[in-house]
């Protein structure tokens, strides 16, 4: 009787690949029946930690992010559908939180930079003419915890006021009994009568006004006696600004006598330090040196009467020089030609004489030999 056969177990090396294949099949089937990570939004976020895969029918909940709040009863959850996609939803139910309304300041205006009071936006403030801003010019809508609040208190517009303008010696200004001046209020200065024979002159701007920064538009003027010396010019005379006394801003115009020209400005003005500005000019005699030829006419647009004559004389001189050179060249050429002709004729005559002498000598020698 044959012994019973043994049952052999499959080799582990063969079992491991089978288990791995089965696991892959199960994993693939489970992945194919799942959804990936749920969608993300600007205004909403998941209430739970996201997972890489979700089963069909699994549900996720959303809530508004910081700085947003629920505005409408829309869906705030999504479900993994049978086609392995998420049920579409929107973050429209969550809107930005807004800062409280700030009205226009009295005598001013509040301007929204982006037309909204939601956090992240700005509110600008400006004042009307005659008022200036006290406080911050720009406020920002910011998040403080979970609330939207402004970055500071709203400013106010206050009326522009100036203190009384300064008083001056030997003079006064209008509205001297007013203690406070408003925006663009103006005062005018004037000088008092002088105790002596010469009057006071007002040096500077006579009128100043209250500006937008609560200061006056300029310094106060000065009242003092300004008197310039009588202007004297040799070899010349005044033609305008005549007078016996010359006070502040007096203007004098000069001209020189015939045969003299002016050195300096022909117009001078008496300035605030009692001197002429620029200084009184001088009249200097016109030089008659032959090296300097004065033009007959200095009026622009009119020709010099001698200019045409000089130009015509220059042209005739050049023409005569050219003609003389041409005549000289012609004479030299003709003389050289005659000289060469004479040399040629003389050479021919000398040759003939020498040939005759040579023939006579030859005949004599022949006779002697015979």
Swiss-Prot record:
Record topological domains on the Extracellular side: 33-315
Repeat as UniProt keyword: yes
Residues modified by glycosylation: 114, 287-289, 292, 294, 296
Any one GO biological process: complement activation, classical pathway
Main localization category: membrane
Keyword Signal part of the UniProt annotation: yes
One Pfam match: Sushi
Membrane topology, record value: Single-pass type I membrane protein
Sequence ranges on the Cytoplasmic membrane side: 337-370
PROSITE patterns tied to this protein: SUSHI
Residue stretches making up the Sushi domain: 33-96, 97-159, 160-225, 226-285
Matches recorded under SUPFAM superfamilies: Complement control module/SCR domain
Disulfide bridge positions per record: 35-80, 64-94, 99-141, 127-157, 162-210, 191-223, 228-270, 256-283
Localization, UniProt: Cytoplasmic vesicle, Secretory vesicle, Acrosome inner membrane
First and last residue of the signal peptide: 1-32
InterPro entries: CD46 (IPR017341), Compl-Cell_Adhes-Reg (IPR050350), Sushi/SCR/CCP_sf (IPR035976), Sushi_SCR_CCP_dom (IPR000436)
A cellular component annotation (GO) from this entry: cell surface
Transmembrane residue ranges: 316-336
PTM note: O-glycosylated.
Keywords: Complement pathway, Cytoplasmic vesicle, Disulfide bond, Fertilization, Glycoprotein, Immunity, Innate immunity, Membrane, Repeat, Signal, Sushi, Transmembrane, Transmembrane helix
Primary role: Acts as a cofactor for complement factor I, a serine protease which protects autologous cells against complement-mediated injury by cleaving C3b and C4b deposited on host tissue. May be involved in the fusion of the spermatozoa with the oocyte during fertilization. Also acts as a costimulatory factor for T-cells which induces the differentiation of CD4+ into T-regulatory 1 cells. T-regulatory 1 cells suppress immune responses by secreting interleukin-10, and therefore are thought to prevent autoimmunity.
Domain commentary: Sushi domains 3 and 4 are the most important for interaction with C3b and C4b.
Description of how the protein assembles with itself and partners: Interacts with C3b. Interacts with C4b. Interacts with moesin/MSN.
The protein's name in its UniProt record: Membrane cofactor protein
UniProt source species: Saguinus oedipus
Lineage: Eukaryota, Metazoa, Chordata, Craniata, Vertebrata
Gene: CD46
């Amino acid at each position: 009787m044959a012994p019973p056969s043994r049952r052999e177990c499959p080799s582990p090396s063969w079992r491991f690949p089978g288990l791995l294949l089965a696991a892959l099949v199960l994993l693939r089937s489970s992945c194919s029946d799942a959804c990936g990570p749920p969608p993300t939004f600007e205004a909403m976020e998941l209430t739970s930690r996201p997972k890489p895969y979700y089963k069909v029918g699994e549900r996720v909940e959303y809530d508004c992010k910081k700085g947003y709040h629920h505005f409408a009863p829309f869906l705030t959850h999504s479900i993994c559908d049978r086609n392995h996609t998420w049920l579409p939803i929107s973050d429209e139910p969550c809107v930005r939180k807004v800062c409280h309304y700030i009205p226009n300041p009295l005598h001013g205006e509040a301007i929204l930079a982006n037309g909204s009071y939601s956090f992240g936006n700005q509110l600008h403030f400006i004042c009307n003419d005659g008022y200036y801003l006290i406080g911050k010019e720009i406020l920002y809508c910011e998040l403080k915890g979970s609330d939207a609040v402004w970055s500071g208190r709203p400013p106010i517009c206050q009326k522009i006021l100036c203190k009384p303008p300064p008083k001056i010696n030997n003079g006064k200004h209008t509205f001297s009994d007013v203690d406070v001046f408003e925006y663009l209020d103006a005062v005018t200065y004037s000088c008092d009568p002088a105790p002596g024979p010469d009057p006071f002159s007002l040096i500077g701007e006579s009128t100043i006004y209250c500006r937008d920064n609560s200061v006056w538009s300029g310094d106060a003027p000065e009242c003092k006696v300004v008197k310039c010396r009588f202007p004297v010019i040799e070899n010349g005379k005044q033609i305008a600004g005549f007078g016996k006394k010359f006070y502040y801003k007096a203007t004098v115009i000069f001209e020189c006598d015939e045969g003299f020209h002016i050195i300096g400005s022909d117009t001078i003005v008496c300035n605030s330090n009692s001197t002429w500005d620029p200084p009184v000019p001088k009249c200097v005699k016109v030089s008659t040196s032959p090296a300097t030829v004065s033009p007959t006419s200095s009026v622009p647009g009119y020709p010099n009467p001698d200019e045409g004559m000089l130009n015509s004389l220059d042209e005739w001189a050049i023409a005569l020089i050219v003609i003389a050179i041409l005549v000289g060249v012609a004479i030299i050429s003709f003389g050289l030609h005659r000289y060469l002709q004479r040399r040629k004729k003389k050479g021919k005559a000398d040759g003939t004489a020498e040939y005759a002498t040579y023939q006579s000598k030859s005949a004599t020698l022949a006779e002697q030999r015979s």
